[in-house]
Amino acid sequence: MSEFVTVARPYAKAAFDFAVEHQAVERWQNMLAFTAQVTRNEQIAELLSGAVAPETMSTTFIAVCGDQLDEPAQNFIRVMAENGRLLVLPEVLQQFIQLRASLESTVDVEVSSARALNDEQLAKIAAAMEKRLSRKVKLNCKIDKSVMAGVVIRAGDMVIDGSVRGRLERLADVLQS
């Protein structure tokens, strides 16, 4: 089964990259779910594990799927059939779903400041962090008097210290060395 994971990874990544590029992630996930279900059919599974020519296999598989597959998805199936990989479609679907989840996930960003920030400041911070992290962000604001002025932003293990206190500490370190 771990072999299926390794084999499916590049196919899932290619399908996902194509879907994102063409803004069709939902449609591709649905098509992959349908094809994964088709491979679970006993008769189709026998056909796929038999010694059938790749062209015949892909033609039959696409015919079974009918109009559920658009042209790029049919090409994807042909490539997988040429390489004898149609049986890993369920794993391709699982990895596609994981890639989609990581793309659409949000990052919790903690913003500490000496005083409450206004909506415009929060919007600028959110936009900058979304650009930097390439993800949607959810700001959690807290007031911390020790910051003095400026902000300290934490996202996972990344810390951006734009506070006066942080600047003074860095200046003190430079002067002591």
UniProtKB/Swiss-Prot annotation:
Keywords: ATP synthesis, Cell inner membrane, Cell membrane, CF(1), Hydrogen ion transport, Ion transport, Membrane, Transport
GO biological process: proton motive force-driven ATP synthesis
Annotated Gene Ontology cellular component terms: plasma membrane; proton-transporting ATP synthase complex
Classification via PROSITE patterns: ATPASE_DELTA
Main subcellular location of this protein, as a coarse class: membrane
Membrane topology: Peripheral membrane protein
Subcellular location: Cell inner membrane
Pfam family, one: OSCP
Keyword Lipoprotein: no
GO molecular function: proton-transporting ATP synthase activity, rotational mechanism
Lineage top rank: taxon: Bacteria
Family: Belongs to the ATPase delta chain family.
Function: F(1)F(0) ATP synthase produces ATP from ADP in the presence of a proton or sodium gradient. F-type ATPases consist of two structural domains, F(1) containing the extramembraneous catalytic core and F(0) containing the membrane proton channel, linked together by a central stalk and a peripheral stalk. During catalysis, ATP synthesis in the catalytic domain of F(1) is coupled via a rotary mechanism of the central stalk subunits to proton translocation.
Subunit structure: F-type ATPases have 2 components, F(1) - the catalytic core - and F(0) - the membrane proton channel. F(1) has five subunits: alpha(3), beta(3), gamma(1), delta(1), epsilon(1). F(0) has three main subunits: a(1), b(2) and c(10-14). The alpha and beta chains form an alternating ring which encloses part of the gamma chain. F(1) is attached to F(0) by a central stalk formed by the gamma and epsilon chains, while a peripheral stalk is formed by the delta and b chains.
Protein name as it appears in the record: ATP synthase subunit delta
